[in-house]
Amino acid sequence: MASSSSMQMVHTSRSIAQIGFGVKSQLVSANRTTQSVCFGARSSGIALSSRLHYASPIKQFSGVYATTKHQRTACVKSMAAEEEEVIEPQAKVTNKVYFDVEIGGEVAGRIVMGLFGEVVPKTVENFRALCTGEKKYGYKGSSFHRIIKDFMIQGGDFTEGNGTGGISIYGAKFEDENFTLKHTGPGILSMANAGPNTNGSQFFICTVKTSWLDNKHVVFGQVIEGMKLVRTLESQETRAFDVPKKGCRIYACGELPLDA
C-alpha cells in the first residue's frame, strides 16, 4: 500500500516558542510539506495546528517538532461508571466502534467512539471499515504516534507509524466531506490532513475545545466511553516530535452494536 509523502499534523494552542511550529527560523530550516495539524515535523507527515500556529491549518507533517515532556499518569480502567467529560453529541450516533489500547505493552483499557454517519457518511464509513479491518488493512496494531497534553492524541498511520503514511478505503486520499460539525470539546474525533481534501486514515481525539480547527478538519464522531483512558494517553511522557516514550498501541479494534 502506498503511503503519504507528507506528514499530517494538528496545530495546538500553545505559544509558537513552546511548540516550535510557527517559528519562522524552524520553518525555514525545515522547509518541507506540512500536512494539516502542524507541530513541527520530520521528513513529512500529518500534524495538527496549535492556536499559536492559528494561521496554518492542521496538516500532514513536514515542519519542526517541539520537544515536550509530559508526566505519565497511572493507567485507569475506562469503566462506564467512571466516565467523565462526555459531552452532548452534536449529531445522531449511527455507528459505534472501539479501540482496545495497551501502553508500554500492558493493557490499558478501551475507548468507545460514536460516529455521525448522517452528517458525514463517507468519512464515517472510512473510519468504521478501518476499525473492522474488512478491507484487509486498518487500525489494528497501529499506534498513537503523536501526543500533546492539553490538545490531542493523534493516530491512524498504519503504513509508516510516524505520521507520514496511512491510506483511506477510497484510495490514498479523499475530499473534505463538510465542516458542519465542530471541535466543541474533549473527546471530539476528527480527521488529520495535509491541507484541503487530503484525508486518509490519520485521525485525532481532542482533549480540549479546539475551535481554531473548525472548517479545516472534518469532525465525524466523539468518544462516548473511555475518556479516562484518553486522559491517560494524553499524559504520557514524550520525547522529540511529541512521540510517546512508551508505545501506545491499538491491539484490537472493531464495531459494536448500537445498543451495546
From Swiss-Prot:
GO terms for cellular component: chloroplast stroma. Disulfide bonds join 131-248, 206-253. Binds cyclosporin A (CsA). CsA mediates some of its effects via an inhibitory action on PPIase. PPIase activity is optimal in reduced form and minimal in oxidized form. Reduction of the oxidized form is mediated by thioredoxin (TRX-M). Residues 1-79 form a transit peptide. Its EC number is 5.2.1.8. InterPro entries: Cyclophilin-like_dom_sf, Cyclophilin-type_PPIase_CS, Cyclophilin-type_PPIase_dom. It is found in: Plastid, Chloroplast stroma. Its main location: plastid. It catalyses: [protein]-peptidylproline (omega=180) = [protein]-peptidylproline (omega=0). Induction: Strongly induced by light. PPIases accelerate the folding of proteins. It catalyzes the cis-trans isomerization of proline imidic peptide bonds in oligopeptides. Required for the light-induced increase of thiol accumulation. Assists the folding or assembly of SAT1 enzyme to form the cysteine synthase complex. Links light and redox signals to the regulation of cysteine biosynthesis in response to stress. Interacts with SAT1 and A.tumefaciens VirD2. Residues 98-255 form the PPIase cyclophilin-type domain. One of its GO terms (molecular function) is peptidyl-prolyl cis-trans isomerase activity. GO terms for biological process: protein folding. Ubiquitous, mostly expressed in leaves and flowers. Keywords: Chaperone, Chloroplast, Disulfide bond, Isomerase, Plastid, Rotamase, Transit peptide. PROSITE patterns: CSA_PPIASE_1 (PS00170), CSA_PPIASE_2 (PS50072). Disruption phenotype: Hypersensitivity to high light and rose bengal. This is Peptidyl-prolyl cis-trans isomerase CYP20-3, chloroplastic. Belongs to the cyclophilin-type PPIase family. Gene3D superfamilies: Cyclophilin-like.
